[in-house]
């Protein structure tokens, strides 16, 4: 899909399709009014017939509109003008993408970017239009024998800007948003693959492929023998029951000053999670292929950053393993020693994500990081607390937490902060080791982060629990690509 920006009146566009908005009670948007005037009131006449009243999500195709140069016009209902906010804008952009893609038009000029959205400027609207369009048209068909392709898929979208002065900033917004979409697509593709394809070795191969594509990337892969030498007993306890060897994958991108400390991202990469000996219920266990979405998001961010050549130093670390039950698997009650030297009583082998993360969090001390952010589908408790709307955020550094919350609001990939109070640490006490790997049912998301916080004393750290946002279930089952937009906005802000 190609995107560009353009300034000009809708009636003068030689295109397969021009898209304009109509608000509730048939109120025309500014671009629609221009078309109406040029066509001698044809739009108003058609709307008065009752085919459309402007309700959000409605669409109406018009062909051969008088005194216009386009083949067809798509009217899109935007709802009440006073209520046209970020969710409404995102919703109508998605509607346009799907509707035009099915129409056979290969090109469209979209004037919805001219609509006023409360608190948002033109560049935000352009960026959102690019990413939402790409997300809406995403289709995972790699494993299907027959592809369900559109006969004439949409190839180009031209986004309207108010004036010629907005063209250069608009093109830059398109460039950045396109790179984010490329990274998000990689994240979704990796997460949607089944565990018999996407195992730890496959993730390592994908990192090496990124290195080939982007010459500025360095990649290092630690094998189990390397991790054994480093004392990563927690991480290795997870892969013990699997025939698939664990991998610790590091990607380095140096686009900033040589003396600038890097941002470090750490992704949980459990490529399939049966729960181990603490076996999960069979229902919906297939969705545990998504337990590597944190790792997939790290790889997606690395790709997006390299694609746009962002002036920042960034390290991505993927802790990859498969959690399976067999005769060699870790048992409930086993005690292991982490890379930090702290001992852990594993009361539940299904709380394995924190075990791979804690050793990775110790490992990243060697990079002398500015900040460390881990991303993990860590707890079902986060879904109970926040549902499927917000990423859970916990941090030992308030400014970092605020920066991430702000980036979430900017990108509309939102997060919500939960407390990391010392009182919750009491739930992790063990009679047989320095700590237990679970803290009971109460505050499960918080106690999981409390566990991780014991391995992050030497740097500023934030934890993103994406269990509720990384994938969808049901009819639309599949990975969402979150929180790539949040992380990219954070990095863009930091690099500016």
Swiss-Prot record:
Provide the alphabetized UniProt keywords.
Answer: Aminopeptidase, Cytoplasm, Hydrolase, Manganese, Metal-binding, Protease
Could you name the Gene Ontology cellular component terms for this entry?
cytoplasm
Would you identify the family this protein belongs to, as annotated? Belongs to the peptidase M17 family.
Q: Which residues bind Mn(2+) 1?
A: 273, 350, 352
Q: Can you name one GO molecular function term for this protein?
A: manganese ion binding
Positions with a binding annotation for Mn(2+) 2: 268, 273, 291, 352
Enzymatic reactions: Release of an N-terminal amino acid, Xaa-|-Yaa-, in which Xaa is preferably Leu, but may be other amino acids including Pro although not Arg or Lys, and Yaa may be Pro. Amino acid amides and methyl esters are also readily hydrolyzed, but rates on arylamides are exceedingly low; Release of an N-terminal amino acid, preferentially leucine, but not glutamic or aspartic acids
Tell me one Pfam family matched here.
Peptidase_M17_N
Check the record and name the CDD domains matching this protein.
Peptidase_M17
Active-site residues annotated for this sequence: 280, 354
SUPFAM superfamilies found in the cross-reference section: Macro domain-like (SSF52949), Zn-dependent exopeptidases (SSF53187)
Location within or outside the cell = Cytoplasm
Role played: Presumably involved in the processing and regular turnover of intracellular proteins. Catalyzes the removal of unsubstituted N-terminal amino acids from various peptides.
The protein's name in its UniProt record: Probable cytosol aminopeptidase
What cofactor requirement does the entry state?
A: Mn(2+)
Q: How many cofactor units bind, and how?
A: Binds 2 manganese ions per subunit.
Q: What is the organism field in this record?
A: Thioalkalivibrio sulfidiphilus (strain HL-EbGR7)
Q: What is its EC number?
A: 3.4.11.1, 3.4.11.10
- Give the signal peptide range: none
GO biological process per UniProt? proteolysis
Q: Report the main location listed first in the record.
A: cytoplasm
